[in-house]
Amino acid sequence: MKNEKLYREALQVMPGGVNSPVRAFKAVGGKPIFLVKGRGPRVWDAEGNEYIDFLASWGAIILGHAPKKVVKAVQEEAEKGLSFGLTNPHEVTLAKLVVEMVPSVEKVRFVNSGTEATMSAVRLARGVTGRKYIVKFEGCYHGHYDSLLVSAGSGVATFGIPGTPGIPEEIAKLTIVLPYNDVQALEEAFKEYGSEIAGVIVEPIAGNMGVVPPKKEFLIRLRELTKEYGSLLMFDEVITGFRLSKGGAQELFGIEPDITCLGKILGGGLPVGAYGGRREIMERVAPEGEVYQAGTLAGNPLAMVSGSETLKDLRDKEPYKELEEKMEKLARGVKDILTEKGIQHTINKVGSMMTVFFTDKKVVDFQTAKTSDTELFAKFFRALLNKGVLIPPSQFEAWFLTTAHEEEVIDEALERIRDAVKEL
């Protein structure tokens, strides 16, 4: 069946024809493609077109598509049952792996998505501290939970305004929004509201304004201030968890938060989220404590098996140096191609994730990220897609590599990108 026919049918039964807005390709133009198969570093659409995949399910895939060991384990588990509604042994296996691999986590609670993880972490921070305000940073996305789907107004430290209809202003005002990487704004906010701040949630490496690394002093000062004022520091490692190192960004930077939110790679391609932290904090979660959170499908056995097999592979093989070297090769190649064409650009990368911004400015926060030429990005995206290279259909997202992206695949992708850029 053709992509366009599928899209027309989807429009009749799903809002915008999709189950997540970015999939509609509104930011890049053209009709969305429908993917039907993935193997290793490649995916195929409903028309049989093949793409080298740098979307990697928005970073959820790190071993390549359909890794045999993971697929086999899931198939075997599926034969035993799809969901039980009570605790299964695989939850214990995955929880032990998370505690082993993530430095700050002593206990962990599984949920079904990154949004559930951040939502639950915020509730826990408020429950533990008895305070109401949450600090987030402009351009950092933490799922579609009411308290976190807010944008900043003008000024250094602003109370949030709703980022979408359906969020009451009264709820949004409980979130203080600050510029990412701005230590002075952070200090001013704590000076004014510190005794009322329950917690600070941050992507330790921003991935939803494109890849924006933190300034060294930013995370250090963030940790110092939260300790000083008795607020909880929450790292949203839904993207960075298990991608940059087996212990995520917190291991990379040597900074331990109070609560860590996980997702994406944690499920090995199946829907899983989690939040975890120090024992005394997590023991405030029901049924041990009074902070309530629950889920019918939380700890689903298929997702637990998929996640466990994925984390075991990452723990045992630690492919991170190799992934970083491959991303360096890809980034250098893309930079050379764009430079030869005379296209202004900035490439930000950390480990196996990168973003190409079409701006001559150094991108250090959401405001500088927004200087990127989004119209040029849309043309770039469509040109790459036509040549068989799939990147995220948004300027403000990351490209990802998997262990299945061998050197020759990178070379092949760069040739396709070179051909595509010639047409810009």
Swiss-Prot record:
GO terms for molecular function: glutamate-1-semialdehyde 2,1-aminomutase activity; pyridoxal phosphate binding; transaminase activity. CDD domains: OAT_like (cd00610). The modification N6-(pyridoxal phosphate)lysine is found at K264. Signal peptide: none annotated. Its main location: cytoplasm. Its EC number is 5.4.3.8. It comes from the Bacteria. Its cofactor is pyridoxal 5'-phosphate. InterPro entries: 4pyrrol_synth_GluAld_NH2Trfase (IPR004639), Aminotrans_3 (IPR005814), Aminotrans_3_PPA_site (IPR049704), PyrdxlP-dep_Trfase (IPR015424), PyrdxlP-dep_Trfase_major (IPR015421), PyrdxlP-dep_Trfase_small (IPR015422). Keywords: Cytoplasm, Isomerase, Porphyrin biosynthesis, Pyridoxal phosphate. Pathway: Porphyrin-containing compound metabolism; protoporphyrin-IX biosynthesis; 5-aminolevulinate from L-glutamyl-tRNA(Glu): step 2/2. It catalyses: (S)-4-amino-5-oxopentanoate = 5-aminolevulinate. GO terms for cellular component: cytoplasm. It is found in: Cytoplasm. One of its GO terms (biological process) is protoporphyrinogen IX biosynthetic process. Belongs to the class-III pyridoxal-phosphate-dependent aminotransferase family. HemL subfamily. Homodimer. PANTHER family: GLUTAMATE-1-SEMIALDEHYDE 2,1-AMINOMUTASE, GLUTAMATE-1-SEMIALDEHYDE 2,1-AMINOMUTASE 1, CHLOROPLASTIC-RELATED. NCBIfam families: hemL, PRK00062.1. This is Glutamate-1-semialdehyde 2,1-aminomutase.
